[in-house]
Amino acid sequence: MLASRSPRRRQILELAGWPFDVQESHADETIPPGTPPDEAVQLLARRKVEAVMSSFPDAYVLGADTIVVCDGRLLGKPRTEEEAFAMLRQLSGRTHDVWTGVAIALPQGSITSFAEKTAVTFWELDDEEIAAYIATGEPMDKAGAYGIQGRAALFVKRIEGDYLTVVGLPLSRTVRELRRLGWPPA
């Protein structure tokens, strides 16, 4: 069971070739001040899993959350176009970290989690480029105000780490963790 509203996470998990269902998770996405990024994404992923697992007690439930960190500042999803502009301006010409946390609930109710980090460097962006990207609407539902798998791919100068961590689900690590935990059942 995938506890997510993200079509990107659904598409990534389909690459594993296992059947799964999707249940939207409406968990609290606030992060306590001062929470380190690796802990923050695991906390949010766990909340998503916890919001869904009681309805599916016999299922493996997977949840994930992604944040962007630049200069020690956590960048979630922008609430306004102005906020998206400010985020993209901050990322312009710089390297930032993208963290994705994954939580997995087992049928017996225990939850395990992990976090993965990928460094992304953007080219220098001008205001017109940023405004044109925001006008597409693409950045509004994405951490850090960009989707690397969309038009923002044009902004990327370099990436160090797992590309799918930036998209929203580090698939190779997730599959290894699921196998370690007994999925798929024999």
Swiss-Prot record:
The keyword tRNA processing does not apply. Keywords: Cytoplasm, Hydrolase, Nucleotide metabolism. CDD domains: Maf. The record marks 8, 66, 149 as: Important for substrate specificity. One of its GO terms (molecular function) is dTTP diphosphatase activity. Its EC number is 3.6.1.9. It holds the Pfam family Maf. Nucleoside triphosphate pyrophosphatase that hydrolyzes dTTP and UTP. May have a dual role in cell division arrest and in preventing the incorporation of modified nucleotides into cellular nucleic acids. This is dTTP/UTP pyrophosphatase. The gene is maf.
